[in-house]
Amino acid sequence: MIMSSYLINSNYIEPSFPPCEEYHQNGYMPVSSDYYERPKDPGFPHHEEASYPRSNYQEQSYDYGNVSTNDLNDFSDRHHAQPQSVSQNHGPRLTTESCVGSDGNKDCSLVSDALPGSQKSKEPVVYPWMKKVHVNTVTASYSGGVPKRSRTAYTRQQALELEKEFHFNRYLTRRRRVEIAHTMCLSERQVKIWFQNRRMKWKKDHKLPNTKIRSSSSAPSNHHVKTDATQQQQTLLPTPCSSNL
């Protein structure tokens, strides 16, 4: 109905288009060889695809079988050198002008200090709680006082054998101490210290006085006894007057 109304109406004017030659002269329509139209998909008749200009670029074929080993080495060198250049860009920028002066003998110590982690190794930090640990050996930088010896942990078998020996002999000779240390895989000093501690415990259990304390305390008492005895002897000696009587 609408199309018929346009045709019936006498005022309808058909649009006029310029000839194709003017399009070629004004550059609106390029040469037909520069354009190509892709085939339309018959499944989608309502969607028209736009035309794209053809590319005049021709890809050159390359023969990979004729690649020389020098080219491969150059490529690998450039590939490995790229991460190093990236890391250098992120680091501090140091120019050679800062090291080289007018006479060429300028000191570059300041430049080396700019990289604290590269040349100087960090010293281990020793905290106070680390100094209180019982250790056998300490480093030269240790300043926590005299190092303490580690306590010997005797096994159950070693403690049992030492108890048996202490039951028969509370004091060991040098020869017997060496034999026990050799059979129990201990040092002579460890056996000696164990017997000393065991004797102290035995005296404490039997409520016996300590010989070390008794010897130190008995020394001045003996001195007083000797002085009293000399005084009594002097009083008992006969005088010349009593002998004449």
Swiss-Prot record:
Q: Main subcellular localization, coarse class? A: nucleus
For the region Disordered, what residue ranges are annotated?
34-99, 205-245
**What's an example GO cellular component term for this entry?**
nucleoplasm
Q: Where is the composition biased (Low complexity)?
A: 230-245
CDD domains registered for this protein in UniProt: homeodomain
Q: Which UniProt keywords apply?
A: Developmental protein, DNA-binding, Homeobox, Nucleus, Transcription, Transcription regulation
Which segments show compositional bias classed as Polar residues?
A: 53-73, 82-99, 212-221
Protein name per its UniProtKB record = Homeobox protein Hox-A4a
